[in-house]
Amino acid sequence: MEKLSVITPVFNGARFIEKLIDSISELKIPYEHIIVDGGSNDNTLKIIKKYKSFIKKIISEKDVGIYDAMNKGIKKSNNDIIVFCNSGDFFYKN
């Protein structure tokens, strides 16, 4: 079965990132979650690190925008199927 890579570019997403990570952790298919934080100055990184057991790779460094962050995530992906899920998004159950 092919695996899914979920890439989350985020900057100052502390308000919603926890809900996103919770929803992804409940997926019933094989996946890897890669989060690319663009150097947030709120609590985003602190929240992400609480969930590190559900996240394959955390990248935290300045970037030059969302597309730079997305490309960084793609380079770290090991799968054929890639989806992007922004910090304010989440998956519904079922």
Task: Go through each PLM region and give its residues.
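Acidic helix N-cap motif at the loop->helix transition within catalytic regions
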Residues: 15-18, 42-50
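Short aromatic/hydrophobic "clamp" motif used to bind/position activated sugar donors
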Residues: 82
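Short, acidic, metal-binding catalytic loop of nucleotide-sugar glycosyltransferases
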Residues: 22-31
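Short beta-strand/loop segment that forms part of the nucleotide-sugar
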Residues: 30-39, 59-62
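Active-site beta-to-alpha loop of glycosyltransferases that engages the nucleotide-sugar donor
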Residues: 8-19, 39
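Glycine-rich, basic loop-to-helix element that forms the pyrophosphate-binding segment
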Residues: 60-77
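Cell-envelope/extracellular polymer assembly enzymes that use nucleotide-activated donors
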Residues: 2-5, 32
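A conserved acidic beta->alpha catalytic loop
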Residues: 37-46, 86
